[in-house]
Amino acid sequence: MKTPRKEIARALRYMQDYKIKKESMIMEYKKFNNQYVIRIDKGEEICAKLKEVAQKENIKLAYLTGIGAAGKVTAGVFDTKEKVFKGHTWEGDLEIVSIGGNINTMNGETYTHFHISVADEAGNVYGGHLTEAVISGTGELVLTEIE
């Protein structure tokens, strides 16, 4: 019997190798027990696509981990004194060093809460609370549903 980790790695390889060339690729995902292995393609926005999966699969609570490449990322911090979100946008060739967070529901609405770290080609790392990340290459994510 294959372990879940091996199954996840196999699914990611399959999705990368089997990629059919189209003008517009769409996100793909596969479920293994309580985990969704997700590939997000160039031009797609991470938060929107993960919310789409959660709603389609009726996921009420889950946590996320992943890596990938983005061309535009907006993230920041909440200023607790001024009670305002201070966001920054980075554009260019950015490696997603790490993305993590959760999906939950409140009053029937799906909410995402993700944090991201990205690195530029000089090795500078930026990050914070994620509001937008547009994929430039591919995003490889694992969403684990909590029952």
Q: PLM features: residue spans?
A:
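Enriched for short, Lys/Arg-rich terminal
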Residues: M1-S24
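N-terminal intrinsically disordered, cationic/polar leader segments
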Residues: I26-H113, S117-E147
